[in-house]
Amino acid sequence: MEEEDEEILSSSDCDDSSDSYKDDSQDSEGENDNPECEDLAVVSLSSDADRKSKNVKDLLRGNLVVQRQPLLPRVLSVSDGAAVCRKPFKPPCSHGYDSTGQLSRRLSARKRFVPWGSSTPVVVALPTKLEASTNIERDEEEEVVCLPPDIEPLVLWQSEEDGMSNVTTIMVHSVLVKFLRPHQREGVQFMFDCVSGLHGSANINGCILADDMGLGKTLQSITLLYTLLCQGFDGTPMVKKAIIVTPTSLVSNWEAEIKKWVGDRIQLIALCESTRDDVLSGIDSFTRPRSALQVLIISYETFRMHSSKFCQSESCDLLICDEAHRLKNDQTLTNRALASLTCKRRVLLSGTPMQNDLEEFFAMVNFTNPGSLGDAAHFRHYYEAPIICGREPTATEEEKNLAADRSAELSSKVNQFILRRTNALLSNHLPPKIIEVVCCKMTTLQSTLYNHFISSKNLKRALADNAKQTKVLAYITALKKLCNHPKLIYDTIKSGNPGTVGFENCLEFFPAEMFSGRSGAWTGGDGAWVELSGKMHVLSRLLANLRRKTDDRIVLVSNYTQTLDLFAQLCRERRYPFLRLDGSTTISKRQKLVNRLNDPTKDEFAFLLSSKAGGCGLNLIGANRLVLFDPDWNPANDKQAAARVWRDGQKKRVYVYRFLSTGTIEEKVYQRQMSKEGLQKVIQHEQTDNSTRQGNLLSTEDLRDLFSFHGDVRSEIHEKMSCSRCQNDASGTENIEEGNENNVDDNACQIDQEDIGGFAKDAGCFNLLKNSERQVGTPLEEDLGSWGHHFTSKSVPDAILQASAGDEVTFVFTNQVDGKLVPIESNVSPKTVESEEHNRNQPVNKRAFNKPQQRPREPLQPLSLNETTKRVKLSTYKRLHGNSNIDDAQIKMSLQRPNLVSVNHDDDFV
């Protein structure tokens, strides 16, 4: 019956019927009397009647089959119709709604309803953000981007078969390729080969981009993401949905970066600082099968809480994990939640893939390509144990050779899907940089408290009884805080926290001048609190010289918010403008602080940064100096923080200072960092040969000797090196010990020798440098033996540090990194000069006061010259009273500070 229906409703039958109707209508006009035509008309009418009755019967029985044919099929056919249907609708007319402004004006023109008895209209929640559509002509103009003549297209894949009709090449869009540097083009190609399966290995579907900070990992990953969202081997996109997981502080930054590079070409949603309902709604919108959203940007914590929403197999085709060292522990809930994704294409971004040990490195590798290195037990037995054993300073030659063989084998495997380039590549695009490790001796108060702590019975009992690790870590934290400033210990004692064990009865060691005479509260001795810490004293002079002599801005980094509080107090007392970013800073406010520091029109000077909260991903190029005030056990944290200023966009010379307290636990922590940095060679295959083999700087036995103090050395790190270069220049050391710092021996550098970055010439000490004070070539950061070794600050290639070191600096390591970009020289800030001139022209009692409450000082009493009068350093007195131009004779005749501690100095004394 269906065949009969099809025959009845065929196009030929319809044509016949139409012709018959036409003939019938012509016959009705009475012009044609031909009998054959009459017979034909009768037959056609009868056939139409039969067909109609038959169709009615089939319609009643439900067996009618209807066939429809398109009108003008050739005219209305669309090439690539499926791809066109996936695009969002755009009005064909050139004068359509091409901006939100027109639509907003039309909506706002409507009269609002005002209820009876009310003077204001009803507030209706309307969407505040409307998607602006663009016309077709404008979209076509944006798609056509011509490459400069000196830039070649980046073809990621090209078909080797001539018979492939769909796609012959996969290439990076010209809007992105014109911004890629050579190493970034290589990185995009490497990631594409891994995630697309072109690598050749069955168990490799992911990769780790382990470039150093500042090499553009974000841009490389965005380029890969956009290419896979648009192209594929069969003509359809290889990736339909992608998830970018990142720390909370970088969610908005990723959204801004994608908008910056590809604009609105990618439909994305970023879940940042949203309510729970908004997060759930956003995730549902993304995971909906027919959703237009292509990319989801989400934090690690948010993904962990809502991981069950992504259980569908089609919810993610590409996973990008930024700051992927967060996945170093495979037992965490975050790691397990991400590992449960069915997505095999995984791209991990981390500038520090090797952080503490090889076990953490295995966790990252196994997450990227599960099973590529076997299970955890096999890795631990076959790779980790021999490599760690061979790196010990006491290892035998056989153990060292076995470690080298296993390291080379591991390197060859992981380098199939790990790409790492050092920041030496940045030298072609950035100004020169110098890294300075500054060893500062502790003050008398710090040394007294330190010795009291390490000799306390509680500490000895805890170490003898093999106390819990948490208790030992508390002792280590207490010593590190003491190295920063005794004020942190004072606050701990007053608060009664557990960290006070070992500091019993220590309040009597603090000077009485630090407390109020009435209430006994801490007052800081009218600014003299700075001099209770060796590192803080050097920092205060460094800030003063920077503010007075240059227009440079500085970033102050610490692991403790209490230390940031001291930085803030110092800036307030000296009236330095500063910004602060720590864990309490909201996500929306962080980028505003960064923008304010990077704005050259703003009068900002110091940026206080918590290494835990803001050490990753921030671009602080508005500052060109950075101080790491205390070391972290994890070298990745310090490296991340130190890389904030030497990044794309930096125009000035960069100075990175690392402060260490001489002979204390801080030097041991830094040695441990260097040992961990040596593990990076496992993933750098070109450095696994015997000639570049390097072991641990700190043995396991040395690590047990954390609670010791060597206050009589210039640098404990340098003492353990047995540096041959410094032994050859021993005569220079003897001259320094005798106080003759200006003697220059026969080992002084020649004028024609290289000064990397021009730092020594800029500081005026190039012709005075000895061989040991110059670095050997371009050493790595962990190769301290090849750095410049300075027993005196006079030879340090940094004029500001020379003027700020004082007696507290005992030793300095320097490493100069070259840069091809000609730096902009620092100048004296005009605002600073005007402020100083204004202060000089004001009476003493009307000048800017150091105290934040800005109250006048008490009247100064005449000087008493009896035996109990304590000598005061003139420079300290001038600093305390905010006037560097007070006449010395005037001070001697009329001023007295009876409660200040006596300080020896080369100046005249009161």
Swiss-Prot record:
A motif (DEAH box) lies at residues 322-325. CDD domains: DEXHc_RAD54, SF2_C_SNF. One of its GO terms (biological process) is biological process involved in interaction with host. Residues 1-39, 828-861 are annotated as: Disordered. The keyword Chaperone does not apply. Residues 1-18, 26-39 have a biased composition (Acidic residues). Its EC number is 3.6.4.-. Disruption phenotype: Increased sensitivity to gamma-irradiation and to the cross-linking reagent cisplatin. Reduced efficiency of somatic homologous recombination (HR). Reduced synthesis-dependent strand annealing (SDSA) frequency. Impaired geminiviral replication (e.g. tomato leaf curl virus (ToLCV)). It comes from the Eukaryota. The keyword Cell cycle applies. Residues 396-417 form a coiled coil. InterPro entries: Helicase_ATP-bd (IPR014001), Helicase_C-like (IPR001650), P-loop_NTPase (IPR027417), SNF2-like_sf (IPR038718), SNF2/RAD54-like_C (IPR049730), SNF2_N (IPR000330), SNF2_RAD54_helicase_repair (IPR050496). GO terms for molecular function: ATP binding; DNA binding; helicase activity; hydrolase activity. One of its GO terms (cellular component) is nucleus. Induction: Induced by gamma-irradiation and by heavy ion irradiation. Induced by the genotoxic formaldehyde (FA). Accumulates in aerial part of low-energy-ion irradiated dormant plant seeds, thus revealing an abscopal mutagenic effect. It is found in: Nucleus. Belongs to the SNF2/RAD54 helicase family. Dissociates RAD51 from nucleoprotein filaments formed on dsDNA. Could be involved in the turnover of RAD51 protein-dsDNA filaments. Addition of RAD54 overcomes inhibition of DNA strand exchange by RAD51 bound to substrate dsDNA. Species preference in the RAD51 dissociation and DNA strand exchange assays underlines the importance of specific RAD54-RAD51 interactions. RAD51 is unable to release dsDNA upon ATP hydrolysis, leaving it stuck on the heteroduplex DNA product after DNA strand exchange. Involved in DNA repair and mitotic recombination. Facilitates geminiviral replication (e.g. geminivirus mungbean yellow mosaic virus (MYMV) and tomato leaf curl virus (ToLCV)). Interacts with RAD51. Binds to the geminivirus mungbean yellow mosaic virus (MYMV) and to the tomato leaf curl virus (ToLCV) replication-associated proteins. This is Protein CHROMATIN REMODELING 25. The lineage of its organism: Eukaryota, Viridiplantae, Streptophyta, Embryophyta, Tracheophyta.
